[in-house]
């Protein structure tokens, strides 16, 4: 007598991976996420490999996780995968204190972000 199985939230031809609490602002992470949105996964991996952004390594790791989920958990063909969605959400913001001159202080905000990548299998139609 257990809980009933929850229905699958994604269609049968999709898989996703989520990277939480990435230590980067959502705006900066969205620049890298926009770089791979809508591309084939091999092209997206190559773009992330040669990107000069610091967070590109974490985005690449999340994309590789989504590809592995598609292959191992959902039996999708890796050669037909496309990044259908790559979206960013805000996580918490650490607030720190920085002592300034004349007894003053300044707040330092250290934002975190969440990244969700959804890959979809797009079959090439035989023409």
UniProtKB/Swiss-Prot annotation:
The keyword Ribonucleoprotein applies. Gene3D superfamilies: Ribosomal protein L22/L17. Pfam families: Ribosomal_L22. GO terms for biological process: translation. One of its GO terms (cellular component) is cytosolic large ribosomal subunit. It comes from the Bacteria. One of its GO terms (molecular function) is rRNA binding. Keywords: Ribonucleoprotein, Ribosomal protein, RNA-binding, rRNA-binding. SUPFAM superfamilies: Ribosomal protein L22. InterPro entries: Ribosomal_uL22, Ribosomal_uL22_bac/chlpt-type, Ribosomal_uL22_bac/org-type, Ribosomal_uL22_CS, Ribosomal_uL22_sf. This protein binds specifically to 23S rRNA; its binding is stimulated by other ribosomal proteins, e.g. L4, L17, and L20. It is important during the early stages of 50S assembly. It makes multiple contacts with different domains of the 23S rRNA in the assembled 50S subunit and ribosome. The globular domain of the protein is located near the polypeptide exit tunnel on the outside of the subunit, while an extended beta-hairpin is found that lines the wall of the exit tunnel in the center of the 70S ribosome. Belongs to the universal ribosomal protein uL22 family. Part of the 50S ribosomal subunit. This is Large ribosomal subunit protein uL22.
């Amino acid at each position: 007598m257990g809980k009933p199985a929850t229905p699958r939230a994604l269609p049968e031809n999709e898989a996703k991976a989520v990277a939480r609490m990435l230590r980067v602002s959502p705006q900066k992470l969205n620049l890298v996420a926009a770089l791979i949105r809508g591309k084939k996964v091999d092209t997206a991996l190559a773009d992330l490999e040669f990107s000069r952004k610091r967070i590109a390594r974490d985005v690449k790791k999340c994309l590789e996780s989504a590809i592995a989920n598609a292959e191992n958990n959902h039996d999708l063909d890796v050669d037909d995968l496309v990044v259908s969605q790559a979206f960013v959400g805000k996580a918490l913001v650490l607030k720190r204190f920085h002592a300034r001159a004349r007894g003053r202080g300044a707040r330092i905000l250290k934002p975190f972000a969440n990244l969700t990548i959804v890959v979809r299998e797009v079959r090439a139609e035989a023409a």
